[in-house]
C-alpha cells in the first residue's frame, strides 16, 4: 500500500510538472502574439485620428487662390462670401492699390465669345438634348442651330462664336457605333435596374467627329472636310483662327502618332495643312503638354510646341507653315507654355533643366535673340506657377514644396516685384511645422545604362539610421503622371507621412516612361508596352536605394498604387516576388486590352497591331508568380477600370490556387470616395493590411 501511494504521489507530481511546463510553453507563445496584437491596436489607435483629420475634417487641406483678371488688366475679381449674401459674389481688387469693391452680381462672369454669350453680349448659346440653341437676351426668342435627333447618340458641343458674332463653330460627336455596356443602377437590391452606356474599348469603334459652322440666325451647317470617310481621329483643338472666315483644327491620328494643324477657309471652301508631325511612338500624349498652338504677329505667325528634336521646344512658324526658328534651343524640356507677351517681346514658359521634380518660370525673346533665362528668383526651390494679366504686367505667383503648402503672391513684372501676399495658408503651414520633424528627402537613383531616376523618401520622426526599416513603395509609373514632384500634394502625401510615423520608410520612384522633363527618349521608353519596363526599373531603383542606404530592409518590402499604379503593383507582385512581399493594388487594370481606347492606344496601339505588347502589359498573364500577400481594392461602380477587368484576374488567381484578399466598395467609381466614410475606411483597411503582413518598426 505504501509503495502504491508513493507511485500515485510521483504520478501526481509528474503530471503537475507537465502541466506547469505546458503552461509555460503556452505563455511563451502567447506572450509574443499578444504583444504583436497590442502593437497593432496601438498603431491603429495612433493613426486613425490623423487619417480622419485628413479625409473627413480637411485639417491639412490648403486653400487655393482663384482670381480672374479683368480684361483691362487693372485688377482682378475673386468670389467671396459677404455679409447678407447667401451665395458668393465677385469682389474686385485693384492690382496697384489693393482697393476692394463688392459687386452686386453673383458668381463668376463667363468670358464673352467662348461658348456662352456672344461677343456683343446680346445672345446666349445653350445645349439641350444633344443640340445647340441660341437665345436672344433682348427679346427672349430661341433659335435651334443644330438638328440631331434625340436618341441618335449624337451630340453637338464645344460651341465657339466667330469674332464678329455672326457664326458659331462646333464639334459634332457621333457615338452610335460605340458598343453599349450594361451597368447596374443602385436601388432595390432584389430588382436592380440596368442602364446602358457606351464604352470605346481598345480596338473598337470610337466616336466619329465633325467640325461644323452654322449661321447665328440658323440654317444649314457647313461641314469641314478634314478627314477621309472611314478615318478614325481625335481633335486636339478647334477654334477661330483670329478672324471670322478661318478655322484652325488640330487633328490627331487614332494612335496619336501623327498630328496636323489644318486651316480652313470657309468662303473658299479650302483646307490647307500649316503644320504636321509624326513619331513612331506618339506626338501628343495623354498629359497634352505640347498640344495646341498660339497665334502671334496678328495671326501672321504662330508658336507651336514640338518634341521633334528629342526635347520639348517652342518653334515659330509663318501662317503659311514655314518654320522660322527654334525658339528654345538646348538639352532641356519646356514643361508647359505660360504666356506670350508680344508687347514686350517675350515668351514665358515653365522649365527645370537641372531637376525633374521642380518647376520654374523662364523666358526667351520672341525674335530669337539671346538665350532662355530664368525669371523665378534663385534660392526658392519647389514648384512655381504663374498666371499673367492680359497685358503681362501683373501676375499671380503660387509656389509650394512637398512639405510646405502653397503661397500666392501678386507680383509685378518685369522685375518680379512682390506687391502683396494673397494667400498664405498660415493655418496649414503652422500645423505642418509642428508635425514635420524630418523633411522629406529627395534623391537620385542611378541604376546604370544612363538611367538616373528621381525618388523621395519619408522616414518616421524617430528614425534611427543605425537600424533597418521596412519599406512601403508608392508607385504610379505610367506616362500620365509623375509621383516624385517637389510640390504640395494632398491627401496622398499626408497619408504617407502618417504611415511613415508607424515605423515605415515610404518611398516613391519615377521610372522611365513617366512624363518627367528629361527628354522625349525618357518619356517614350515604354512605347509598345506599359508594365515590363516600369516593373524592372522600380525594382532596380529599390535595390540601389538599399545599396546606398543600409537602413533599408529589403527583406520587408511592400508596394501600393492606384489605377496605373495598381497595375504596376500587380506586376511587381507577380513578376518580382523576389523583391516585393506585400502589395495593395487599388483600381488596377490587369487586362490592358479591356481598357479604354482613348488612353491605352496612345502607348500600345491595339492587339491587332501589337499582340505581344498587350500580352506583356497585362498582369493577368503573370499571376502564377504571386508568392507574397496581395490585397486588391476596387469599386463596383467603376466607369474607368471596369469591375469585370479585375474580376477576370480574381478568377485567374482562384484557378491557380493563389491566396489573396479582395475588397470591393459597392457602386463606387474610380476614385472610391462616394458615400460617407468611404475614404477613411479604405485607408484604414490598407493600414490594417500592412500592419498584419508587413509589421512596422526598426530592427
For the regions a protein language model found, what residue spans apply to each?
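Predominantly five- to eight-bladed beta-propeller fold
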Residues: 36, 98-100, 145-159, 170-226, ...
Amino acid at each position: 500500500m505504501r509503495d502504491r501511494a508513493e507511485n500515485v504521489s510521483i504520478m501526481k507530481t509528474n503530471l503537475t510538472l507537465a502541466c506547469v511546463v505546458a503552461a509555460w510553453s503556452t505563455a511563451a507563445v502567447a506572450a509574443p502574439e499578444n504583444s504583436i496584437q497590442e502593437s497593432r491596436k496601438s498603431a491603429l489607435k495612433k493613426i486613425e485620428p490623423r487619417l480622419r483629420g485628413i479625409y473627413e475634417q480637411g485639417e491639412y487641406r490648403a486653400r487655393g487662390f482663384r482670381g480672374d483678371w479683368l480684361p483691362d488688366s487693372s485688377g482682378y475679381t475673386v468670389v467671396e462670401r459677404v455679409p447678407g449674401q447667401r451665395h458668393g459674389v465677385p469682389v474686385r481688387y485693384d492690382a496697384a492699390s489693393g482697393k476692394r469693391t463688392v459687386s452686386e452680381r453673383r458668381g463668376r462672369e463667363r468670358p464673352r465669345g467662348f461658348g456662352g454669350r456672344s461677343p456683343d453680349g446680346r445672345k446666349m448659346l445653350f445645349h439641350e438634348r444633344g443640340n445647340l440653341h441660341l437665345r436672344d437676351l433682348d427679346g427672349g426668342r430661341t433659335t435651334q442651330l443644330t438638328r440631331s435627333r434625340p436618341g441618335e447618340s449624337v451630340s453637338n458641343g464645344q460651341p465657339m462664336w466667330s469674332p464678329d458674332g455672326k457664326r458659331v463653330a462646333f464639334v459634332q460627336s457621333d457615338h452610335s457605333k460605340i458598343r453599349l455596356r450594361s451597368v447596374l443602377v443602385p436601388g432595390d437590391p432584389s430588382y436592380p435596374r440596368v442602364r446602358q452606356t457606351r464604352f470605346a474599348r481598345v480596338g473598337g469603334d470610337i466616336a466619329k467627329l465633325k467640325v461644323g459652322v452654322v449661321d447665328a440666325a440658323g440654317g444649314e451647317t457647313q461641314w469641314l472636310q478634314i478627314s477621309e470617310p472611314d478615318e478614325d481621329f481625335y481633335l486636339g483643338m478647334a477654334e477661330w483662327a483670329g478672324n471670322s472666315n478661318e478655322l484652325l483644327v488640330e487633328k490627331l491620328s487614332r494612335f496619336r502618332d501623327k498630328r496636323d494643324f489644318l486651316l480652313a477657309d470657309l468662303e473658299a471652301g479650302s483646307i490647307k495643312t500649316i503644320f504636321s508631325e509624326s513619331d513612331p511612338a506618339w506626338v501628343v500624349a495623354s498629359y497634352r503638354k505640347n498640344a495646341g498652338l498660339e497665334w502671334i504677329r496678328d495671326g501672321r505667325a504662330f508658336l507651336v510646341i514640338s518634341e521633334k528634336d528629342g526635347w520639348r521646344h517652342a518653334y515659330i512658324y509663318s501662317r503659311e507653315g514655314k518654320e522660322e526658328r527654334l525658339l528654345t534651343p538646348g538639352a532641356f524640356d519646356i514643361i508647359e507654355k505660360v504666356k506670350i507677351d508680344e508687347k514686350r517681346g517675350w515668351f514665358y514658359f515653365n522649365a527645370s533643366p537641372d531637376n525633374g521634380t521642380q518647376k520654374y518660370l523662364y523666358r526667351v525673346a520672341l525674335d530669337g535673340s539671346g538665350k532662355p533665362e530664368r525669371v523665378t528668383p534663385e534660392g526658392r526651390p519647389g514648384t512655381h506657377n504663374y498666371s499673367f494679366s492680359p497685358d503681362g504686367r501683373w501676375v499671380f505667383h503660387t509656389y509650394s514644396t512637398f512639405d510646405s503648402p502653397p503661397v500666392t503672391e501678386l507680383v509685378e513684372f518685369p522685375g518680379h516685384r512682390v506687391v502683396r501676399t494673397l494667400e498664405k495658408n498660415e493655418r496649414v503651414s503652422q500645423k505642418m511645422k509642428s508635425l514635420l520633424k524630418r523633411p522629406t528627402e529627395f534623391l537620385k537613383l542611378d541604376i546604370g545604362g544612363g538611367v538616373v531616376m528621381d525618388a523621395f523618401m519619408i522616414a518616421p520622426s524617430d528614425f534611427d539610421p543605425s537600424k533597418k526599416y521596412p519599406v512601403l513603395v508608392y508607385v504610379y509609373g505610367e506616362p500620365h503622371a509623375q509621383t516624385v514632384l517637389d510640390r504640395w500634394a494632398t491627401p496622398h502625401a499626408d497619408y504617407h507621412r502618417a504611415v511613415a510615423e508607424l515605423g515605415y520608410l515610404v518611398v516613391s520612384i519615377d521610372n522611365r516612361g513617366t512624363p518627367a522633363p528629361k527628354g522625349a527618349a525618357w518619356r517614350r521608353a515604354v512605347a509598345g508596352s506599359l508594365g515590363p519596363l516600369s516593373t524592372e526599373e522600380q525594382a532596380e531603383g529599390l535595390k540601389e536605394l538599399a545599396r546606398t542606404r543600409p537602413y533599408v530592409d529589403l527583406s520587408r518590402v511592400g508596394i501600393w498604387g492606384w489605377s496605373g499604379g495598381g497595375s504596376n503593383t500587380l506586376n511587381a507582385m507577380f513578376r518580382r516576388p523576389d523583391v516585393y512581399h506585400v502589395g495593395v493594388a487599388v483600381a488596377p487594370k490587369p487586362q490592358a486590352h479591356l481598357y479604354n481606347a482613348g488612353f491605352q492606344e496612345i502607348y500600345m496601339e491595339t492587339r491587332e497591331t501589337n499582340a505581344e505588347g498587350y500580352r506583356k502589359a497585362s498582369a493577368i498573364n503573370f499571376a502564377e508568380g504571386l508568392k507574397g500577400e496581395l490585397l486588391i481594392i476596387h469599386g463596383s461602380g467603376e466607369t474607368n477600370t471596369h469591375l469585370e477587368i479585375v474580376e477576370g484576374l480574381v478568377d485567374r488567381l482562384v484557378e491557380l490556387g493563389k491566396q489573396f484578399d479582395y475588397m470591393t466598395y459597392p457602386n463606387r467609381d474610380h476614385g472610391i470616395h462616394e458615400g460617407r466614410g468611404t475614404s477613411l475606411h479604405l485607408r484604414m483597411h490598407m493600414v490594417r493590411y500592412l500592419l498584419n503582413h508587413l509589421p512596422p518598426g526598426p530592427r
